[in-house]
């Protein structure tokens, strides 16, 4: 780095602050920093943020120097602003706090007692830190890329860097001493000691001329009323899951926040921090233990909280027109579903449900009450049906995800822990897996192995999407806007059809009802299916990739970007679909009342249908839900219920074939009447999971048996 002339830079900074202007929409010149200096002079604003893009436009080499030596230039900017402020003061400013009154009183006393011809003692003059009632921060260049924590290394020491991650812990905001003021017990003079680090050694002996000449030996006592304090907070930030290489532990970084950048984030927030990367030498007993090693921290200048739609990453760049055209094919829904874990054979409907979980529904907030849009799914089944593999793939695909197991997770580890802060010794909150997966997916394997007291911590998260904490005097609510993907094994090794769902999974009904879809994946012997599965597994084992199929699997990065694009849509449900959705829900309740349904059917199922429908509309990049979306959502719900119900029908010895089941649906639609529209039959049967060719075959079979007649246009069936 070239040597800089700081005196010349001071003049450039003074010119920049007073003369830099931009033209507004009307073509008028607007002095960007001049207006901020007026507010600073009138104490209407505390923080002045210097945009380095503006500085680069004015003087590019100066902007580069600020980035390379940020701490020094922060001090220079602060001194220049302190010089300029008196000229921008247009009116008298009244005292706003005790320190203002104190400074005003001391200046008045000094002007009275001091002889104008007398040289003022510099040691008793007010230090510049005491007189400055503003803060300076820098906004990084727009071309600056947000780094991951492991990318910030030794070459960034002293430079302005931008880092992104997730907040895991925040301390309470405490007052930090900037200038210590002492009063002598003999001569009454005041001494000031600027504090530039986290610790300092208090001054005891009075340095004034009176005590030194007279050898009075005056003692200094700290005067907190006249000292200056700023707000201080320490934040712990951890890498995002997508930034951690496989097999590595996520790294963390300490963020030191001072003044106006405190209270900008809480545990679970995804943030982008711009600040100065600096070493921290410990003192006292910690230095004896630490030796020559030093810790590092980031002195924050700017903190931005980002949500799921504002992810700052090169991977989340906009899709190109060619990629959108590739995804806009007729079979894009099937193609996206088959691209989920293509190495795993089959489970197409399960993969479709997992795709909708990644996209999610739309949150609703009527009158302050929140109705969640995130979709929760529980996969149950026999061992060896690739439940854990599906969870692992979803964990890798989701931008924000946490993977944990039931046996290795405690309630505290999932929600939040109260930790003792090593800096202040006070209790602080540290977010758990559900907090860290905020606005993402939390995959919990071996869900049935969790202890009951730990599992109760998930109840609030799955419906209210928050975590309420009341521990060690800390009472707060953390965000946990997360989709739960759980995998559970039957309690008896394999699913026992003689027992109910609760007895097989051993999960409480209150928890099972919070899942939008409960899917039972069985390992049933079937020669043709077993042959295809064995060929698929041996091919994957030999070639380390999935077998060639008619549909080419999409790249994981492309899928991630498309899902991110889908999440920006907020589709609504038109009024004309209301009767259709209500009728479908009433039918579900009727079947449950007739004890045909082994699962739970409650009002949560209706909300689940709405969530799945809006997720399907999002997947089409549409702004409104269509009837086909609702029909597909109902079909997935029926398929998940059938996975549980069919096994119990098998156990009872009555296994109706497809045509018999379709006939029962048609008979039910007809009721006491004789005629039924074929379009109504198609809608109801596809909702129940039947294919159109199966419905056509059933109609033809029963027409041959003279059970009903079909009109010439094949639009209506009339029973004989």
From Swiss-Prot:
GO BP field: DNA replication; DNA replication initiation; DNA strand elongation involved in DNA replication; double-strand break repair via break-induced replication; premeiotic DNA replication
Name of protein: DNA replication licensing factor Mcm7
Enzyme Commission number, as recorded: 3.6.4.12
InterPro entries xref list: AAA+_ATPase, MCM, MCM7, MCM_CS, MCM_dom, MCM_lid, MCM_N, MCM_OB
One Pfam family here: MCM_lid
Subunit structure: Component of the Mcm2-7 complex. The complex forms a toroidal hexameric ring with the proposed subunit order Mcm2-Mcm6-Mcm4-Mcm7-Mcm3-Mcm5.
Subcellular location(s) per record: Nucleus
Miscellaneous: Early fractionation of eukaryotic MCM proteins yielded a variety of dimeric, trimeric and tetrameric complexes with unclear biological significance. Specifically a MCM467 subcomplex is shown to have in vitro helicase activity which is inhibited by the MCM2 subunit. The MCM2-7 hexamer is the proposed physiological active complex.
């Amino acid at each position: 780095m070239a040597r800089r002339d700081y005196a010349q830079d001071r003049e450039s900074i003074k010119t920049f602050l007073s003369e830099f202007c931009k033209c507004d929409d009307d073509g008028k010149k607007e002095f960007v920093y001049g207006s901020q200096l007026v507010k600073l002079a009138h104490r209407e604003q505390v923080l002045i943020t210097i945009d380095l893009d503006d500085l680069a436009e004015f003087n590019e080499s100066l902007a580069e120097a600020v980035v390379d030596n940020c701490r020094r230039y922060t001090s220079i900017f602060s001194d220049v602003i302190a010089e300029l402020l008196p000229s921008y003061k247009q009116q008298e400013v009244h005292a706003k706090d005790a320190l203002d009154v104190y400074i005003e009183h001391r200046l008045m006393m000094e002007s009275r007692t001091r002889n104008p011809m007398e040289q003022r003692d510099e040691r008793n003059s007010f230090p510049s830190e005491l007189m400055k009632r503003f803060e300076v921060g820098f906004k990084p260049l727009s071309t600056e890329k947000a780094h991951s924590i492991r990318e910030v290394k030794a070459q960034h020491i002293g430079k302005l860097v931008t880092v992104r991650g997730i907040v895991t812990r925040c301390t309470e905001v405490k007052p930090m001493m900037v200038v210590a003021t002492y009063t002598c017990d003999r001569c009454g003079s005041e001494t000031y000691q600027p504090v530039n680090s986290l610790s300092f050694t208090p001054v005891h002996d009075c340095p004034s001329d009176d005590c030194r000449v007279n050898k009075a030996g005056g003692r200094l006592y700290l005067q907190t009323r006249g000292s200056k304090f700023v707000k201080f907070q320490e934040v712990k930030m951890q890498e995002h899951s997508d930034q951690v290489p496989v097999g590595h532990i996520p790294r963390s970084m300490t963020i030191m926040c001072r003044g106006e950048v405190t209270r900008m984030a809480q545990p679970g927030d995804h943030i982008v921090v711009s600040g100065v990367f600096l070493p921290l030498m410990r003192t006292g007993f910690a230095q004896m233990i630490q030796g020559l090693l030093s810790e590092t921290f980031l002195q924050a200048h700017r903190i931005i909280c980002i949500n799921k739609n504002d992810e700052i990453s090169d991977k989340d760049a906009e899709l190109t027109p060619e990629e959108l055209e590739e995804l806009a094919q007729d079979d894009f829904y099937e193609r996206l579903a088959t691209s989920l874990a293509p190495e795993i054979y089959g489970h197409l409907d399960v993969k479709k449900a997992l795709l909708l979980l990644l996209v999610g529904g739309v949150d609703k907030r009527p009158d302050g009450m929140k109705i969640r849009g995130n979709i929760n799914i529980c996969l149950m089944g026999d061992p060896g049906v690739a439940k854990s593999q599906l969870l692992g793939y979803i964990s890798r695909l989701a931008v924000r995800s946490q993977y944990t197991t039931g046996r290795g997770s405690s309630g505290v580890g999932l929600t939040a822990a109260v930790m003792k802060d090593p800096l202040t010794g006070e209790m602080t909150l540290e977010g758990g897996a559900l907090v860290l997966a905020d606005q993402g997916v939390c995959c919990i394997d071996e869900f049935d192995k969790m202890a009951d007291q730990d599992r109760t911590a998930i109840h609030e998260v799955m419906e209210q999407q928050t975590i309420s904490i009341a521990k060690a005097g800390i009472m707060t609510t953390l965000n946990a806007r997360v989709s739960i993907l759980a995998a559970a094994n039957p309690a008896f090794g394999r699913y026992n059809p003689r027992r109910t769902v609760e007895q097989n999974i051993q999960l409480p009904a209150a928890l099972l009802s919070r899942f939008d879809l409960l899917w039972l994946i069985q390992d049933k012997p079937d020669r043709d299916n077993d042959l295809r599965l064995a060929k698929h597994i041996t091919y994957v084992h030999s070639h380390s990739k999935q077998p060639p199929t008619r549909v080419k699997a999409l790249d994981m990065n492309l899928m991630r970007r498309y899902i991110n694009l889908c999440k920006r849509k907020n589709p609504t449900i038109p009024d004309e679909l209301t009767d259709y959705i209500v009728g479908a829900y009433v039918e579900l309740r009727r079947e449950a009342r007739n004890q045909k349904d082994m699962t739970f059917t409650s009002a949560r199922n209706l909300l689940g249908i709405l969530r799945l429908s809006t997720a399907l509309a999002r997947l089409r990049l549409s702004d409104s839900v269509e009837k086909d979306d609702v029909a597909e959502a109902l079909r997935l719900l029926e398929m998940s219920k059938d996975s549980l119900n069919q096994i119990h029908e098998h156990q009872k010895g009555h296994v109706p074939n497809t045509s018999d089941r379709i006939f029962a649906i048609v008979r039910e639609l007809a009721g006491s009447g004789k005629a039924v529209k074929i379009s109504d039959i198609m809608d109801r049967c596809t909702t129940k999971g039947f294919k159109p060719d199966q419905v056509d075959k059933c109609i033809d079979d029963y027409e041959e048996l003279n059970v009903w007649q079909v009109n010439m246009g094949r639009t209506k069936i009339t029973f004989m």
